[in-house]
Amino acid sequence: MGDVLISDRPPSPARLSHTSEKHPRVTLQELNVLRRHRELCDVVINVKGRKIFAHRVILSACSPYFRAMFTGELEESRQTEVTICDIDENAMELLIDFCYTSHIVVEESNVQPLLPAACLLQLAEIQDICCEFLKRQLDPENCLGIRAFADTHSCRELLRIADKFTQHNFQEVMESEEFLLLPVGQLVDIICSDELNVRSEEQVFNAVMAWLKYNVADRRQHLAQVLQHVRMPLLSPKFLVGTVGSDLLVRSDEACRDLVDEAKNYLLLPQERPLMQGPRTRPRKPTRRGEVLFAVGGWCSGDAIASVERFDPETADWKMVAPMSKRRCGVGVAVLNDLLYAVGGHDGQSYLNSIERYDPQTNQWSCDVAPTTSCRTSVGVAVLDGFLYAVGGQDGVQCLNHVERYDPKENKWSKVAPMTTRRLGVAVAVLGGYLYAIGGSDGQCPLNTVERYDPRQNKWCAVSPMSTRRKHLGCAVFNNFIYAVGGRDDCMELSSAERYNPHTNSWSPIVAMTSRRSGVGLAVVNGQLYAVGGFDGTAYLKTIEVYDPETNQWRLCGCMNYRRLGGGVGVMRAPQTENYMW
């Protein structure tokens, strides 16, 4: 045998590092067993005669309230039984259970005592869960009660949401019994808001008078105080004179008559209006419905998916909504008449020609839309002149140049002129009355060519090509340019991006995205350009980035719930329901 080589360096000690994932869970479980058996317990919490055995160290670790009680100089630090008043005994037991189990169920029957108890014990996580539960329960009948509850317990985020909900749904809230029971101060807080969502100021006046007449004897003294927040100069002259001015309660109060006279002067003396501006002449800003982004279907974890999620830029939250009835990757998505259409795609086994339509007001998909004449995946979909166009794609046999359009009034598809080039993984955009088909693949190699369709002539013609071949790219119209981002060329996924100027018929580069993205969705939401998901050559992506044209920079801005390759994106106005306000 040959010589054994021995290093001069001393051998490093053997080492195996281990962190147990089950240890914390098992430890907590055993501590709870000890508590249930009243073993090693060193304190009893007495709430209205109910005695709850516990360990000081566990309560102190979970609750700043208990930590201050047991580690300070308070008398309770030396007591084996501590009495706590002004708290619900069932809520206390639930919270101590949570300290030992990390589990709690919040429901309608316990949330009202549970929230103040969590506030007392300074259990911020439970406070947040209670507030989230109440946010989900908001409706026009209870929002004022929830608002008062949030105000009492200093839940500022819940108070903000309840205020926003009340303002947004004032037309329904004013008809509730809770509205009629409001104290005068809370009524004033509501009606003085610029954000009150009303069709006209007449609704505000009618709401105030309904509140007043619910208890005239006690409330007529507050009439002028309340009416000064009704913007009478914005009433119609007919309503001001015929309804407000003739009301006996208004006529019997001098301060109210002065408010009516002020409004009459504003209406009758237009030349004097610049000198009469004030809070009562300022139009309210109805709660604007911002835009939200939907990410639809795609490919995730080796399979097509049916899931759909919605992004609200105001909160930067992604929320799951109703899934489609079929799994769809390579799906074409567009919005027509405030409805979201999902066209074609592939379900993991078959190429599809079926279509689904989503109504955000009901959070439901319907399948009563006529199918396309051809099965299509990797299809481009866009809306032009009230028609939904399906452009290119593949049907499982060949790459397509077919184009057809859908008439929602007739629920019917009809073919229009085909493209000059077959294109799958094509991006489409509408600008200046034309439908653009950008890039894609002809079935052999990626394309940089671009053609546009003129519906007036039913004809396609070529425009300037992109600088880069791209298939499965993202495309959107932003500030009167067509942006093309990501995709894949002959050999790799792309992060590069460029934009098309229709006035000069030319493409120019912009800064690359932070990630390579093929199968990326691109959309403009509330004036910002978002790139959604895709594939970077190694992994499916759920990250989102947004482009700032002023700085020519992309920045990451959160993640979807699902990784998505080849999903569709669509942008809609947020529905006027509480489900879409957060």
Curated annotation (Swiss-Prot):
One of its GO terms (cellular component) is cytoplasm. Pfam families: BACK, BTB, Kelch_1. Probable substrate-specific adapter of an E3 ubiquitin-protein ligase complex which mediates the ubiquitination and subsequent proteasomal degradation of target proteins. May have a role in synapse differentiation and growth. Keywords: Actin-binding, Kelch repeat, Repeat, Ubl conjugation pathway. Residues 143-245 form the BACK domain. One of its GO terms (molecular function) is actin binding. GO terms for biological process: negative regulation of synaptic assembly at neuromuscular junction; proteasome-mediated ubiquitin-dependent protein catabolic process; protein ubiquitination. This is Kelch-like protein diablo. Pathway: Protein modification; protein ubiquitination. Residues 41-108 form the BTB domain. It comes from the Eukaryota. The keyword Cytoplasm does not apply. Residues 1-21 are annotated as: Disordered. The gene is dbo. Kelch repeats lie at residues 292-338, 340-386, 387-433, 435-480, 482-527, 528-574. It comes from Anopheles gambiae.
